[in-house]
């Protein structure tokens, strides 16, 4: 089994290996590994990597890698394939032979540095999975810096074609795309909303013709609201029509909120962003400490608990793993950690 790990500016490919016992770390000592070994690398043209998606296309494995914006020292690295300086965007790498990854294409992103540019997020769906997609096509959804979402036809990953763009935004981030339905929960910054990031729900079942369903966020974030603005969205995770839940995480490193939403009510309920309509699909909301965020809210549902195996009730639990993100280096903020919430009684989630 192969696993992919992205460092600040490289693609690192590992394979399972024999166990190596960790020793005391010493400057200049050889590298250590446990249950894996280094197979291959690619420097990604020295572009800082954020999110990878590894997709099986035909008889190949293709890595689609989102990048942060450039740095003060190198705002736009040179692309050796074109000979031109290009703002960081999306790297496309053939990793079928992990010992020899082949860089196929760089798609430039928004000009800018760090969080202000690049194309950080990428999702990929097969056309044969999407209800109205071309069954012979493969589609990539990505952010374009802070200003847009883009959909590309990547059937030939070396020659992507832009087919749709959702622009006019003030921010974007880590979206979620259901490949079986085409429903996309896009982390956006609608210009008239009071928060930097909220959710725009789109039907991307026909990727070339996006259809907007609604805007969504926490009451107090909507246009025309007054008072304090609730914590901005970081990202959602949907369980699809079968699970009928969307788990939203608000806050990156402070003021975190876990929100559990009825997916069907979100898609089919009243759309006007009034406080009542925004509350309508919500099942529960769990505020966290002001010191910690809810960067990722990952559902792990119907989990057996070995210690409870003989209990009459509660032998399995619905758990949400909540991951914070540290933003400031050298202890410049509160300690960011991983938390686990029991949402078995979903109207009363509790941290465990």
Residue ranges of model-derived segments:
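N-terminal secretory signal peptides that target proteins for export/translocation
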Residues: 1-2
């Amino acid at each position: 089994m192969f696993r992919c790990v992205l460092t600040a500016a490289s693609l690192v490919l590992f394979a399972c290996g024999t166990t190596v016992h960790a020793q005391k770390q010493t400057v200049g000592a050889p590298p250590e590994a446990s249950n894996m070994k280094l197979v291959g690398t690619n420097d990604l043209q020295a572009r800082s990597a954020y999110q990878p998606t590894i997709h099986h296309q035909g008889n190949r494995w293709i890595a689609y890698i989102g990048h942060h914006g450039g740095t003060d020292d190198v705002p736009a690295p040179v692309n050796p394939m074109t000979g031109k300086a290009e703002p960081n965007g999306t790297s496309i790498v053939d990793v079928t032979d992990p010992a020899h990854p082949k860089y196929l294409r760089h798609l430039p992103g928004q000009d800018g540095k760090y969080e202000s540019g690049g194309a950080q997020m990428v999702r990929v769906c097969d056309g044969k999975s999407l209800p109205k997609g071309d069954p012979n096509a493969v589609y990539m959804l990505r952010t374009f810096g802070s200003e847009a979402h883009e959909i590309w036809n990547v059937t030939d990953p070396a020659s992507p074609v832009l087919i749709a763009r959702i622009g006019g935004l003030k921010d974007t981030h880590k979206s979620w795309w259901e490949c079986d339905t085409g429903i996309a929960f896009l982390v956006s910054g609608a210009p008239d909303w009071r928060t930097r990031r909220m959710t725009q729900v789109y039907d991307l079942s026909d990727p070339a013709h996006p259809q907007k369903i609604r805007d969504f966020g926490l009451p107090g974030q909507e246009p025309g609201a007054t008072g304090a603005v609730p914590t901005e969205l970081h990202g959602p995770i949907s369980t699809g029509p079968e699970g009928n839940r969307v788990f939203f995480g608000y806050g990156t490193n402070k003021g975190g909120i876990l929100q559990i939403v009825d997916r069907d009510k979100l898609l089919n309920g009243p759309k006007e962003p009034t406080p009542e309509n925004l509350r309508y699909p919500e099942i529960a909301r769990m505020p966290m400490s002001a010191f910690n965020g809810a960067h990722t809210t990952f559902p792990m549902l119907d989990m057996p608990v070995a210690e409870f195996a003989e209990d009459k009730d509660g032998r399995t639990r619905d758990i949400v793993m909540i991951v914070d993100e540290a933003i400031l280096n050298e202890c410049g903020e509160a300690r960011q950690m991983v938390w686990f919430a029991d949402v078995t009684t979903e109207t009363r989630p509790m941290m465990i």
